[in-house]
């Protein structure tokens, strides 16, 4: 099932018991965070606060608070089915030439579908049903969440920031948090390596002193939102990818103040510009690490137009110590990454980003080991293959007999198959998450690789241990007599 806009997804969730409407007046200042946090930790539904205190616009939170709802947003019934999305991305990233005539015929539908999914421009879009300019622009009228007691100001969290570099043929969609600075100003917190920041830097170089047009879409359709956090090939727009997943072209419209294209069914659109040198101190904010981050200067986004649907819905979230919504999103997208990594490294059996690791700071990978040093090759490849893993600080490599998603298994492998000196790889002065205050320098830190695989000749001079395994015939016999033993509530091994 596909969803053309956020509202149709809300209806679908409600019909399936995955959304709860809250009519009680709840304050966007701290109260929504506390409620959403409790519900997420209980694996509860998405929440629609219909009467936010001192505001007239409903607030939607916890939309992607379970892997199941992430899968539902992409038209799947189960998070494991998201591997199909990963297989599609793996194909689009590195399409294989046909192995013969039959293979070429089989691949035609996929190529044709990919080529036929450019966005569709529409007139009179829903997102421009209400238009506010000049003195009418007032961001304080939006029910923007103030998430934590130590946060400096309310924070826009789920906005899709739309930019375009002067030398690029396609737009970039990114999700960057934005601090409320005034009635018409937000601080655009994009790090220097992110797509929006790169587009802006390129624009300043090409057109020094000029204003850079930027648009932020709030409450886009769920597939487009998730497309912005998925490793879409650089040659393909997030709109085209969203259309491919939806099976229907993404509807877009021209912004009123510039040539940027925005999702036509979005709930709210913020249009404006970033001045060449206007910066402001951003933060502190409670973040996905579970700590308040440091402050730093980032560009100021001046909003000149606010357009929105009639009876618009404000989409929001909070970030905090895992589990939070980004962590749940990471659990679901984990399944997308597996086929992409396998495409490059077929020896990978499974891949896991534990949510306790703040979504991406630790990865555990199981492999079919084939030669000495193989684990180190895979860990280096994982760090460099996808930009999503640039900030992964720790990678643990285990053999295929170890379940990389089971900490008991992983800890057993680390403690029995590793020598701390021989099997630890340390790399200094690598890109690191700006929010990681444990690094010695902001944005620059080290990485650690742990080779917890069985060691081959050349990696050790000692005879390697043989794992203890029960005789299969004995196991089979005990299975057959288990009920007669009268041992209640014990598992069959």
Curated annotation (Swiss-Prot):
InterPro entries: UbiD (IPR002830), UbiD-like_C (IPR049381), UbiD-like_N (IPR049383), UbiD_bacteria (IPR023677), UbiD_Rift_dom (IPR048304). It is found in: Cell membrane. It is a peripheral membrane protein. Pathway: Cofactor biosynthesis; ubiquinone biosynthesis. The active site is at 287 (proton donor). Its cofactor is prenylated FMN; Mn(2+). One of its GO terms (cellular component) is plasma membrane. Pfam families: UbiD (PF01977), UbiD_C (PF20696), UbiD_N (PF20695). GO terms for molecular function: 3-octaprenyl-4-hydroxybenzoate carboxy-lyase activity; metal ion binding. Its EC number is 4.1.1.98. One of its GO terms (biological process) is ubiquinone biosynthetic process. Mn(2+) binds at residues 172, 238. Keywords: Cell membrane, Decarboxylase, Flavoprotein, FMN, Lyase, Manganese, Membrane, Metal-binding, Ubiquinone biosynthesis. Prenylated FMN binds at residues 175-177, 189-191, 194-195. Homohexamer. This is 3-octaprenyl-4-hydroxybenzoate carboxy-lyase. It comes from Shewanella baltica (strain OS155 / ATCC BAA-1091).
């Amino acid at each position: 099932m596909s969803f053309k806009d956020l509202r149709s997804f809300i209806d679908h969730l409600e019909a399936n018991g995955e959304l709860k409407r809250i009519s009680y007046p709840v304050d966007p200042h701290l109260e929504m965070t506390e409620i959403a946090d409790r519900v997420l930790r209980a694996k509860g539904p998405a929440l629609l606060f219909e009467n936010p205190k001192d505001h007239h616009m409903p607030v939607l939170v916890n939309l992607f608070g379970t892997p199941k709802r992430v899968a539902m947003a992409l038209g799947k019934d189960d998070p494991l089915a998201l591997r199909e999305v990963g297989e599609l991305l793996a194909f689009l990233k590195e399409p294989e030439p046909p192995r013969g005539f039959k293979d070429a015929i089989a691949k035609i539908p996929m190529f044709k579908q990919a080529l036929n999914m450019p966005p569709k421009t529409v007139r009179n879009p829903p997102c421009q049903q209400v238009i506010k300019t000049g003195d009418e622009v007032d961001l304080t009228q939006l029910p923007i969440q103030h998430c934590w007691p130590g946060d400096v100001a309310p924070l826009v969290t789920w906005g899709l920031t739309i930019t375009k570099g002067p030398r690029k043929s396609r737009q970039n969609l990114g999700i960057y948090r934005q601090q409320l600075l005034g009635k018409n100003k937000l601080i655009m917190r994009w790090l220097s390596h992110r797509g929006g920041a790169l587009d802006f830097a390129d624009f300043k170089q090409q057109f020094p002193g000029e204003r850079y047009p930027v648009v932020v879409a709030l409450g886009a359709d769920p597939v487009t939102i998730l497309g912005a956090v998925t490793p879409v090939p650089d040659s393909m727009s997030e709109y085209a990818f969203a259309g491919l997943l939806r099976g229907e072209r993404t509807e877009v419209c021209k912004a009123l103040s510039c040539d940027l294209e925005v999702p036509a069914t979005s709930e709210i659109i913020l249009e404006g510009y970033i001045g060449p040198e206007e910066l402001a101190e951003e933060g502190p904010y409670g973040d996905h690490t579970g700590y308040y981050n440091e402050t730093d200067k980032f560009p100021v986004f001046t909003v000149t137009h606010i357009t929105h649907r009639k009876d618009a819905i404000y989409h929001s979230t909070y970030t905090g110590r895992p589990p939070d919504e980004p962590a749940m999103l990471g659990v679901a997208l984990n399944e997308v990454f597996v086929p992409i990594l396998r495409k490059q490294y077929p020896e990978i059996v499974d891949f896991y980003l534990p949510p306790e690791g703040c979504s991406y700071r630790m990865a555990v990978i199981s492999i079919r080991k084939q030669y000495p040093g193989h684990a180190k090759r895979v860990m280096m490849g994982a760090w460099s293959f996808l930009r999503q893993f640039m900030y992964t600080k720790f990678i643990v490599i285990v053999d295929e007999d170890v379940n990389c998603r089971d900490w008991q298994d992983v800890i057993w492998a680390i403690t029995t198959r590793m020598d701390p000196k021989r099997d630890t790889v340390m790399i200094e002065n690598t890109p690191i998450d700006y929010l990681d205050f444990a690094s010695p320098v902001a944005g620059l830190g080290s990485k650690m690789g742990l080779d917890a695989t069985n060691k081959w000749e050349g990696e050790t001079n000692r005879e390697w241990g043989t794992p203890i395994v029960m005789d299969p015939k004995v196991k089979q016999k005990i299975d057959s007599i288990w009920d007669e033993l009268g041992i209640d509530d014990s598992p069959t091994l």
